[in-house]
Amino acid sequence: MASVSELACIYSALILHDDEVTVTEDKINALIKAAGVNVEPFWPGLFAKALANVNIGSLICNVGAGGPAPAAGAAPAGGPAPSTAAAPAEEKKVEAKKEESEESDDDMGFGLFD
């Protein structure tokens, strides 16, 4: 879990990026001081140097895109390979369930202007 100091620097960097201002140590310090947060003096410089050559916008868009996920139909080691004919049938079942759930929401009486 991130400390308060780390979070203050992260939020400061995000605010600066949102305002399309370059992220520098002085600007991070100014935002932290304005927020009234006590931060160890090395954090703003560390974050400013770490984000100097990084496209923050692409970082935001790629959060959670860690690495390749294993295939959904992968067989356990030594087991038989799964049949490929079962995959389209499963997709049709999922689509049918989605359609049913969307239709059932209409009958709940949660309409805004009913």
Curated annotation (Swiss-Prot):
Record Gene3D superfamilies: 1.10.10.1410
Cross-link (Glycyl lysine isopeptide (Lys-Gly) (interchain with G-Cter in ubiquitin)) at residue(s): 92-93
GO MF assignments: protein kinase activator activity; ribonucleoprotein complex binding; structural constituent of ribosome
Coiled-coil segments: none
Highest taxon of the lineage: Eukaryota
Phosphoserine PTM positions: 101
Keywords, alphabetical: Acetylation, Isopeptide bond, Phosphoprotein, Ribonucleoprotein, Ribosomal protein, Ubl conjugation
UniProt record similarity statement: Belongs to the eukaryotic ribosomal protein P1/P2 family.
Subunit-structure text: Heterodimer with RPLP2 at the lateral ribosomal stalk of the large ribosomal subunit.
Annotated protein name in UniProt: Large ribosomal subunit protein P1
